[in-house]
Amino acid sequence: MSRDRDRARPDTRLSSSDNESDDEDYQLPHSHPEYGSDSSDQDFELNNVGKFCPLPWKPDVARLCADTNKLFRCFIRCRLNSGPFHDALRRALFDIHMIGRMGYRLKQAEWETIMNLTPRQSLHLRRTLRDADSRSAHPISDIYASDSIFHPIAASSGTISSDCDVKGMNDLSVDSKLH
């Protein structure tokens, strides 16, 4: 399988007038279903939300443990019945691992929905995915989970992140969000 398929790309950088659109309408031209096209450095400088995955990414099991333990502690502090949240986090971590282990990729929209990011917020994530893919000693095929044995995820009606308005979240039932 040729690893050069993603390296030779036409220049699809956005002009400065393209960057003025609303975040919800922001779309990069797609050259790859998982991480889209290259963006200008200016796009990355303007985007602070996605800086949770800086280049170069490398495996860090201690960080993974610390991050998941923060979430478990948060669940315990915030909810009287945190069991369903613990199960949901464990299931999500396991599902992501198994999708990769089975040799499947996720498409850009799926990453954005799973990680609760808008297309603009996902720029750093997609740049890191592209970089990790180019450095990988074990290339994976271009088989996408939603195109094969799995059901594609429905487009979300919106994202909920630290910089988004979360009015009405208290009205949602735990069971409807977890299943």
Curated annotation (Swiss-Prot):
Top-rank lineage group of the source organism: Viruses
UniProt keyword Metal-binding present: no
Coiled coil: none
Residues spanning the signal sequence: none
Keywords: Early protein
Transmembrane segments: none
Record flagged with keyword Nucleotide-binding: no
GO biological process: regulation of gene expression
InterPro entries membership: IE68
Cited Pfam families: Herpes_IE68
Stretches the record annotates as Disordered: 1-40
Biased composition (Basic and acidic residues): 1-12
Assigned protein family: Belongs to the herpesviridae ICP22 family.
Name the UniProt record assigns to this protein: Transcriptional regulator ICP22 homolog
Native organism: Gallid herpesvirus 2 (strain Chicken/Md5/ATCC VR-987) (GaHV-2)
